């Protein structure tokens, strides 16, 4: 739907145009008009908007630091709060209603859209549960609504299911909220949705679980049968851990045990001879040749340098695979000390994530994209917190600012901003799905 309006306005006069819209229909649009803009001036709306933003951003009172750091902090918090978008409206009685992008019908309740959980499960939603729990409550209800209307949980809503990125990170959102006391949604229906998400494939590769049959049979997703197979395996293992935690918390021991076992599948792709996560084919053979700096192929927007750390749910298990805390610490050190070399791999050209890693000049650490953003904090789990402190401060002070070039890469629905907000406050949700930062 589009419209073109032309006005004949005498020189020197001002024209005020008030517009309202609705995804539901004309009647709802007029309701929105009366509530939001009728008889209001631009100045009135500016004041209302300022009050609303202050009420949200004022929940965190930053102290210390200089003016530039304050500007950067609140600029990042502003970006965190831009997504996901509210896709619901209020009917005559003031109750929430929405047009569903999944079944095309009007429903009572809440709906959200424009959010890629592959990015935002890491820090955005854990920040919501802590500072904006009422937002998390509505998002959890919306996730269950999405499942009931489409048969799947969303992984990248835009406005409905979109074939983008990988993983079952909706399971992380639900588990993290539940474990932190946000329980105003149907837990049994949520568990049903979570299990189904791991045992079916939607029309888009990112909806459901791509390669779930092979994952269950082999203990990993084989490559090259499936693109991004190693990254998928690692993300599935984490999601299985989330599902196990959620099932156990509501008393479903049998499901919890099944998925706890699956959560250990990450071990199947660790090669002790080189200390990296690698790809295997369906016969269990390592894919050769292996180059830790090669992007794409079995990985998503990264290389083995970035995904080897994607075991947020079992850091001690990963350390054991590497030979212990000292060896894991040395491996982390080498990520920062290695040259920023790369092989474009299956991408065939230098994607912007590669260019950003090189420009950041932090070795193989690629803060400009999401998969490795938690890795700095792993030092805290192996008895070397001073190294985490050093690198966190380096990233805070060198890779962010309040200007137009204030980000070092993808900001992605607030995730890179949420990293700054959490880290500036002195904590980070390394493993969403447990009440720990």
Which positions does each model-derived feature cover?
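N-terminal catalytic cores of secreted or lumenal carbohydrate-active enzymes
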Residues: 71, 158-178, 182
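Mobile, glycine-rich extracellular loop/lid and propeptide segments
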Residues: 121, 136-141, 146, 161-166, ...
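A residue-level signal for conserved active-site and pocket-lining positions in enzyme catalytic cores
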Residues: 12, 76, 174, 315, ...
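Active-site core of glycosidic bond-cleaving carbohydrate-active enzymes
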Residues: 107-132, 171, 181-437
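Glycine-rich phosphate/pyrophosphate-binding loops
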Residues: 133-151, 431-434
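Acidic/polar, glycine-enriched structural segments that form the non-catalytic walls/loops
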Residues: 1-111, 152-155, 184, 188, ...
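Primarily short, surface-exposed interaction patches in extracytoplasmic proteins
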Residues: 76, 143-158, 247
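Amphipathic, well-ordered alpha-helical segments in soluble domains
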Residues: 52, 56, 139, 239-242, ...
């Amino acid at each position: 739907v589009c419209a073109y309006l032309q006005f004949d306005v005498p020189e020197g006069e001002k024209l005020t145009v008030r517009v309202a819209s609705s995804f539901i229909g004309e009647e709802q649009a007029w309701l929105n008009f009366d509530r939001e803009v009728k008889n209001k001036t631009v100045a009135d709306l500016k004041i209302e908007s300022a009050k609303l933003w202050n009420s949200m951003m004022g929940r965190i009172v930053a102290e210390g630091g200089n003016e530039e750091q304050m500007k950067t902090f609140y600029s990042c918090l502003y970006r965190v709060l831009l997504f996901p978008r509210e896709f619901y409206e209020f009917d005559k009685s003031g109750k929430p209603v929405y047009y569903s992008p999944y079944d095309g019908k009007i429903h009572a309740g809440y709906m959200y859209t424009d959010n890629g959980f592959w990015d935002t499960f890491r820090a955005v939603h854990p920040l919501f549960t802590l500072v904006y729990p009422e937002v998390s409550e509505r998002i959890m209800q919306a996730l269950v609504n999405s499942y009931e209307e489409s048969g799947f949980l969303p992984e990248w809503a835009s406005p409905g299911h979109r074939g983008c990125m990988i993983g079952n990170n909706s399971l992380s959102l639900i588990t993290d909220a539940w474990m932190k006391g946000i329980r105003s949604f149907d837990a049994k229906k949520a568990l049903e949705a979570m299990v189904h998400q791991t045992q079916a494939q939607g029309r888009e590769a990112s909806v459901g679980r791509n390669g779930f049959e092979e994952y269950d049979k082999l203990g990993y997703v084989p490559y090259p049968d499936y693109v991004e197979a190693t990254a998928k395996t690692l993300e599935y293992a984490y999601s299985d851990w989330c599902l196990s935690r959620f099932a156990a918390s509501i008393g479903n021991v049998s499901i919890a045990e099944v998925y706890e076992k699956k959560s250990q599948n990450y071990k199947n792709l660790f090669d002790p001879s080189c200390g990296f996560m690698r790809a295997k084919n369906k016969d269990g053979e390592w894919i050769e040749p292996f180059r830790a700096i090669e992007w794409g192929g079995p990985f998503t927007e990264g290389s083995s340098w970035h995904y080897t750390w994607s075991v947020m749910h079992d850091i001690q298990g990963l350390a054991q695979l590497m030979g212990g805390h000292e060896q894991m610490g040395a491996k982390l050190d080498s990520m920062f000390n290695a040259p920023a070399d790369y092989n474009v791999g299956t991408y065939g050209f230098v994607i912007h994530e590669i260019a950003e890693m090189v420009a950041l000049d932090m070795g193989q650490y690629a803060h400009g994209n999401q998969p490795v953003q938690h890795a700095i904090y792993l030092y805290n789990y192996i008895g070397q917190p001073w190294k985490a402190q050093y690198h966190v401060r380096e990233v805070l002070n060198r890779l962010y600012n309040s200007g137009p070039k204030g980000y070092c890469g993808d900001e992605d629905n607030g995730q890179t901003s949420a990293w700054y907000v959490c880290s500036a406050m002195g904590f980070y949700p390394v493993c969403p799905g447990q009440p720990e930062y």
